[in-house]
Amino acid sequence: MSMLGRNPGEMPFLDHLEELRWRALWSLLAIVVGAIVGFILVDRMEAMTLLIRPIEPFLEGGKLKYLSPTDPFFVTLKLSLIAGLVLASPIVIYQIWSFLAPALMPSEKRVIVPALYMGVVLFLGGVVMSYKIVLPMTLRFTMGFQTEFLEQSIVIGPYMAMVTRLLLAFGIVFELPVVILILSALGLVTPEFLASKRRHAVAGITILAAVLTPGDVITVTLMMMAPLVLLYEFSIILSRVVTRRRRVAEAAAGAQA
């Protein structure tokens, strides 16, 4: 029997596990439905055409090649799964939030809820930046090495894998302020700690950018590093604001006690 109608904060341990199981099942169902809807949208909205557009100027006849008759289908399937994850993400986040919210303080909820909305904006901002700026520059750089002695044979599978990886990578790393904001609201990190670890953060950002971006294009790595460093500094500012409010609230609660 589902435990969704009960308050997780008042449940025994086994009921917590039951609640978690149902939340996970609803999330999985949302992803499956999202993938089905994504398959329809990818086909009708010509999502593949949109992703191919940045490389069209470099293609003979404006078309990509494929090596197997099944390649177009599997590429469409992968795009549908990615679209399904994106479409289902609000429901998945809601399920996670519904499970964790009863254990949070009202002051923490007031910070985390707006942070989740900000996360959507930042994710879309990262994807748009990648598609409009980073991807075209990457293609111009890599295709600039083509000579008369080389014949291009750009295959749809590897190209789509590179594009989706780049778009998702920028979308995900742009969530850094949201993560730090939530951790600050929970009291797990402080602005003093973040500022003292700035050098370590830059080193970590460098490694992360190198892992997430195409390894043979150093320009793309640098283009991911620059906004990430700025986002880290912005996160420190957000952490100061949230931590100051949290400390004031804790002091007021202590005075009343």
Positions of PLM-derived features:
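Membrane topogenic/interface segments and analogous intrinsically disordered interaction regions
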Residues: 1-257
